[in-house]
């Protein structure tokens, strides 16, 4: 796409009177700052009349089913709401135009009005909690929505057909500098044994990309008279839900149970490999996933990188991962095969996407090379090299689009059902 022009996403209101243009759908959180949300809204002047053009950005945490939103009680908490009066521009909302806004206004004309939002760095990233097989409607989790509409004031009731709603994502990418190599060790002294059992485990690195195998090096020194009967390795996802109070949910996303034994007065060393995949965890209701924009496949939620001193109460969902290594040790004696004792260590690590490579500068498109793509709408190819793509979700078989979801948002899971 980089050699065809600057891609701009657009979405129109159902009545066709407003259209919002954004340069991207993913906005990167760099820990100390977040990329601004900048775009323009194109309004039919005959429809606008004497009203004003407003754009809002909302970060919300939905934690229950929409069909239970009755009597003014909703299972949704707005973590952040910002409003901009795009036209006529309010003095406090007027900001210098970005390069994208300048180009869009030049192309779209005088009825295109700019808007810019600054996202606070301590807000959560977009996370979806995996629904169960029978769940329908909007999934629980944290999402960001841009909404544009015309009204006399912000309190006026806005109908869906007269407004534009776009779901965007706040994302983080793996840091360029990894942390120290995760290692952990423990020593256990047993009754009736003069010497201890020592377990040491390590990972080959601290940062893993989604889909990358995790190598776990396990070293056991068994100086006891006990036998290690089994070694269990698991990758666990931890999701801290910070809402009215803080609760932690853990879920194994990859496991291996090896029948490797370690006899008394012996040592053992082996490298185990596990790869956490969402495909192997489809049935796990409430598993944290990266936020979705379309009905396309996603992945396990990325680890959350926190800024020092961040207010954890405002962070909706904090995701982390650990590898757990557990030795199942026979106690010996008459109950040796029936009773056992566990020795375990945990290794925290980071699971994320790598930072995308910077796109090369866009080249001008010669007239004879005008690209043809039925999925894109391109205007004035030779003028300013901008390509417009519909923002709406792709409709797949058995899936609902945005409008259907909003009108039939039932059956999504509640946190208490996890």
Curated annotation (Swiss-Prot):
Record motif [DE]-X(1,2)-F-X-X-[FL]-X-X-X-R motif, residues: 385-395
Predominant localisation class: cytoplasm
Disordered: annotated segments: 353-375, 397-418
Keyword entries, A-Z: Cell membrane, Cell projection, Coated pit, Cytoplasm, Cytoplasmic vesicle, Membrane, Nucleus, Phosphoprotein, Protein transport, Signal transduction inhibitor, Transcription, Transcription regulation, Transport, Ubl conjugation
Entry text on domains: The [DE]-X(1,2)-F-X-X-[FL]-X-X-X-R motif mediates interaction the AP-2 complex subunit AP2B1. Binding to phosphorylated GPCRs induces a conformationanl change that exposes the motif to the surface.
Entry's family note: Belongs to the arrestin family.
Protein name from the UniProt record: Beta-arrestin-1
Organism: Bos taurus (Bovine)
Gene name linked to the record: ARRB1
């Amino acid at each position: 796409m980089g050699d065809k022009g600057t891609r701009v996403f657009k979405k129109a209101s159902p009545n066709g009177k407003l259209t919002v243009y954004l340069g991207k759908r993913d906005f990167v959180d760099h820990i100390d700052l977040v990329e601004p949300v900048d775009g323009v809204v194109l309004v039919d002047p005959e429809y606008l009349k004497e009203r004003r053009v407003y754009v809002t950005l909302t970060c919300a945490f939905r934690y229950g089913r929409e069909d239970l939103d009755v009597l003014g009680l909703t299972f949704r908490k707005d973590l952040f709401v910002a409003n901009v009066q795009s036209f006529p521009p309010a003095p406090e909302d007027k900001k210098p135009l970005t390069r994208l806004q300048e180009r869009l206004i030049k192309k779209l004309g005088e009825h295109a009005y700019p808007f810019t939002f600054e996202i606070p760095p301590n807000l959560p990233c977009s996370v979806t909690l995996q629904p169960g097989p029978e769940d329908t409607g909007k999934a629980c989790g944290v999402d960001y929505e841009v909404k544009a509409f015309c009204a006399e004031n912000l309190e006026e009731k806005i109908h869906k057909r007269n407004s534009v709603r776009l779901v965007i994502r706040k994302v983080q990418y793996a840091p360029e500098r990894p942390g120290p190599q995760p290692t952990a060790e423990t020593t256990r002294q047993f009754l009736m044994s003069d010497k201890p059992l020592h377990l040491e485990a390590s990972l080959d690195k601290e940062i893993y990309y989604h889909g990358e195998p995790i190598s776990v090096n396990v070293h056991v020194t068994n100086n006891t008279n006990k036998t290690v009967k089994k070694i269990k390795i698991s990758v666990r996802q931890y999701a801290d839900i910070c809402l009215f109070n803080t609760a932690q949910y853990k879920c194994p996303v990859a496991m291996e149970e090896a029948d490797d034994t370690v006899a008394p007065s012996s040592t053992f060393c082996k490298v185990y490999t596990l790869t956490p995949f969402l495909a192997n965890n489809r049935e796990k209701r409430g598993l944290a996933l990266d936020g979705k924009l379309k009905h396309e496949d996603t992945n396990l939620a990325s680890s959350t990188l926190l800024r020092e001193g961040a207010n954890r109460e405002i962070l909706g969902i904090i995701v982390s991962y650990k590898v757990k290594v557990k030795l199942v040790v026979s106690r010996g004696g008459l109950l040796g095969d029936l009773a056992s004792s566990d020795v375990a260590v945990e290794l925290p690590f980071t699971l994320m996407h790598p930072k995308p490579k910077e796109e090369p500068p866009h080249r001008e498109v010669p007239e004879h090379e005008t690209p043809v793509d039925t999925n894109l709408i391109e205007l004035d190819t030779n003028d300013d090299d901008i390509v417009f793509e519909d923002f709406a979700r792709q409709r797949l078989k058995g899936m609902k689009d945005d409008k259907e979801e909003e009108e039939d948002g039932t059956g999504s899971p509640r946190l208490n059902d996890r």
